[in-house]
Amino acid sequence: MRPHERFHDFLDDFRNPYSRDRDRIIHCSSFRRLEYKTQVFLNSSGDYFRTRLTHSIEVSQIARSIASHLGLNETLAEAIALSHDLGHTPFGHAGGDELDRLLKKHGFEAGFDHNFQSFRVVSKLEKRYPNFEGLNLTFATLEGILKHSYPYQKSFLDAAMNEIFALDYHPSLEAIVVDHADEIAYVSHDIDDGIKYGLIRLEDLEESELVGEMIDKAEQEGVKRSEKVFRYRFVSNLINHLVYGFLEGSQEARLHQGEVRSAMIPSGERLPLGFSPEMGRKLKKLKKLLFTKLYRHEQVNRKMFFGRGCIRALFEDFMNEKNLLPKELQERINQGGKAHRVVADYIASMSDRYAMNLYKELHIG
């Protein structure tokens, strides 16, 4: 298939193909539910914390800026970025890990993967047309959703779909840009959220070269650490610095300007896009610090422990009592749908708040 083509013919309008993709994503119910899904901190913890929705918007802004600088297709990058987290479960990665464990326990060997679930949302679960499932997005956007993060999960697709989406090859350069924009956004903004709510201090991260350099830069701007604006200047400088580090390592990509595909580069070969070696080294150290200092903070662990328990209980409830499911999902099972797959789709679609309220309704009353 050509990048701009769709699996189902549909009347085109005045927009370009990737603008239509972006608009369909923004208007779908799964996108709206991202407002109440956890990034790192549970949504109920405070209205300041970033959610999957705000994160997706931030990723799309960074991805568009990078794509523009490299002469790539900005709108395709935006569409992939806005949809890249549609498949996330409630309670962040802890929820996804628990659903993965439960699916494997019930005989679904491939388990759960949020990238594939995002693909499943836009290609099957969203119901927008009378004659086919999904949002009918272009091939390039679907491929970017499926393959924006390496390694690619071949076990989720049949042989025909593996061949169509060429999982032995890298995706478009725009999809690779989104993967790195995602990394830039979550590292910077998780630090921001963590500091805001007292889970970490900048001093806890100063052994990171990146953090030290950005602290120095903010101080050189005449901002004192005691000032509220210091955190904003630090985060802004960190994002800019990471973007420049990516652009510095991606000059070769200019040779591919105007192309949507990545010239079918085998997945084991080096890409023309990526952080410079120095920036890659610094970022790796910072992420390691964040893992120990923030992502494994006791308050985060407690919330994630609750989230895993909530998903586990709901999954077992629905598997044991199918009549607890919405009628349309009961019908899917009665018509031959695999119960564990139907239940997983349902739970993955829930917001944090909905999952917590349903858990309380079934177990506390």
UniProtKB/Swiss-Prot annotation:
Keyword vocabulary terms for this entry: Hydrolase
Disulfide bonds: none
Entry's Gene Ontology molecular function annotations: triphosphoric monoester hydrolase activity
HD domain sequence ranges: 52-187
UniProt similarity note: Belongs to the dGTPase family. Type 2 subfamily.
Name of the protein in question: Deoxyguanosinetriphosphate triphosphohydrolase-like protein
Organism: Wolinella succinogenes (strain ATCC 29543 / DSM 1740 / CCUG 13145 / JCM 31913 / LMG 7466 / NCTC 11488 / FDC 602W)
Phylogenetic classification of the source organism: Bacteria, Pseudomonadati, Campylobacterota, Epsilonproteobacteria, Campylobacterales
